[in-house]
Amino acid sequence: MLPQIPFLLLMFLTLVHGMFYAERYQTPTGIKGPLASPKTQYFIPYAIKSKGIPVRGEQGIPGPPGPTGPRGHPGPSGPPGKPGYGSPGLQGEPGLPGPPGISATGKPGLPGPPGKPGERGPYGHKGDIGPAGLPGPRGPPGPPGIPGPAGISVPGKPGQQGLTGAPGPRGFPGEKGAQGAPGVNGRKGETGYGSPGRPGERGLPGPQGPIGPPGPSGVGRRGENGFPGQPGIKGDRGFPGEMGPSGPPGPQGPPGKQGREGIGKPGAIGSPGQPGIPGEKGHPGAPGIAGPPGAPGFGKQGLPGLRGQRGPAGLPGAPGAKGERGPAGHPGEPGLPGSPGNMGPQGPKGIPGNHGIPGAKGEIGLVGPAGPPGARGARGPPGLDGKTGYPGEPGLNGPKGNPGLPGQKGDPGVGGTPGLRGPVGPVGAKGVPGHNGEAGPRGEPGIPGTRGPTGPPGVPGFPGSKGDPGNPGAPGPAGIATKGLNGPTGPPGPPGPRGHSGEPGLPGPPGPPGPPGQAVMPDGFIKAGQRPRLSGMPLVSANHGVTGMPVSAFTVILSKAYPAVGAPIPFDEILYNRQQHYDPRSGIFTCKIPGIYYFSYHVHVKGTHVWVGLYKNGTPTMYTYDEYSKGYLDQASGSAIMELTENDQVWLQLPNAESNGLYSSEYVHSSFSGFLVAPM
């Protein structure tokens, strides 16, 4: 059965091929060839010419099919046919397995997707304790915490006697008691602990001391008084004559009315006279004004440990390195006042201190009567300029001489060294107690500071030996100046001889207006009530600009870092202060010309935060705060326009001791400026 299958297939193909051949290659025209396609070709039948008569025979009977020819070569593959119509046939049986292929290493495939997280494993065993880590850097100070609830007060056991507390505030001076008997000289007590108290109020001026003996006679020739001539005929106004010697003081007349405030330039300070005879040793003076607090230290605060038992006192150790500044602790309660000790012996005279802060300007005194004009003396020949001598000790003040002729402006002299401070005078009598002042306005609340933990008290060391007297401290903050009562006028002293002419001193403060002069002066010279001129320009123009508007301006620099807290900051290096309205010793600007002013300040911050305020007459006008970043140098500035009247005062001040990191040095300047914008 199987060998007949290929034979039947060949027979089927032969029949199909024969039917296709008969239909394709037999045409009705009798022309051999393929039929024309009705779409692409058009066949036109035509008759073939021949020499004979065309005879067309009848179609014969088709002969029997010939034998099957040999199978031809497979033709070229035709174009793909159109998709047929019909349902797909049944799936054939799987073929025989093919021969094994050649194995070769394939390329690595793409990474698969991440697997699902596995289940949580069991807890491992506890590991050993690791080594202690290094201490981390100090973090920034945290915000102040919420105050905790009030604790339950339980009376505790009485503790041991505490250390002597800080001295309390200075009380009011009591009434002068009767003089007691001198006590036995006691031993000198140890140096106490505590911050210096605030300077007390200024006492009333003491009684005027006795007049000292006149100084030695100065070297020089005094002209003889000429005889008064007879009055001649009044002629033309002549040149001013030499100023004659001052006559003897006349009897004191009745006090006149207070004159108007004069306009003038302060005269030059007179030359120091010959040293006088040293007087007797005076009484010990009152303690000086406390100096400003020192620069804040820097220290790292440790954790408070448990209080141990008190051990034996050890030897005093060597001074350690300066640590970082710790947080300020709370002030302790004032201790009980101790019993007064016996009066010790009088100590040796201390080193003269620096000049104190100038007091308030006193009232203008009464104008005395003018003395009679003296006779004109002969003018001596001018002497040669001598070498500059060393500054002598201050002598006794002689009588005020008559003003001389205006001299030419000399070259600026070399600034002399400040003289030693003279001995303090005797204590004056007790003044009349003043009235209690009205309560001032309540200040604005300050920035809350961070509260640090209180450390345990240290073991007290052995008392050290008495140290050498220290250098005089810097002047402290300005005290509250109270106006004292005018003391009685002392008797006039005998006139001393005229001393040598010294070098011109620094210009002094303006004095009270003098009485109107009676001397007749020619044109071109100073008259009573006339403004002095210098080089054709009024001296009052130093306070006026080019346009005639009044001028008041200053710019100053702070030379030392970390100024005192609670007092005006003394900017002591002057860039411009021609009108002298700013005082570099106190750091206060005093308004002399009422109007609108502009103030500005620029400060640097280092070590801790800074909180600086602009004050007007003791009241803060505005604040500037800068939070310090460790390792950096910050800046802060502020400015304001203010309306000032005469004698108003403006300054900069640090109101808080915990925010006092105001820094200034030789190359990093903190400055303060102000100027008049428009007068009123």
Curated annotation (Swiss-Prot):
Biased region (Gly residues) positions are 410-419
Instruction: Tell me a GO biological process for this protein.
Output: cartilage development
Q: Which residues bind Ca(2+) 2?
A: 634
Q: What is its main location?
A: secreted
Leader sequence residues: 1-18
Listed GO cellular component terms?
Answer: cell cortex; collagen trimer; collagen type X trimer; collagen-containing extracellular matrix; extracellular matrix; extracellular region; receptor complex
Q: Where is this region: Nonhelical region (NC1)?
A: 520-680
Q: Name one GO molecular function term.
A: metal ion binding
For region Nonhelical region (NC2), the annotated ranges are 19-56
Where does the protein end up?
A: Secreted, Extracellular space, Extracellular matrix
Q: According to the UniProt record, where is the region Triple-helical region?
A: 57-519
Quick check: keyword Protein biosynthesis in the entry? no
Primary role: Type X collagen is a product of hypertrophic chondrocytes and has been localized to presumptive mineralization zones of hyaline cartilage.
Record's protein name: Collagen alpha-1(X) chain
What does the record give as the organism's lineage? Eukaryota, Metazoa, Chordata, Craniata, Vertebrata
Gene symbol?
Col10a1
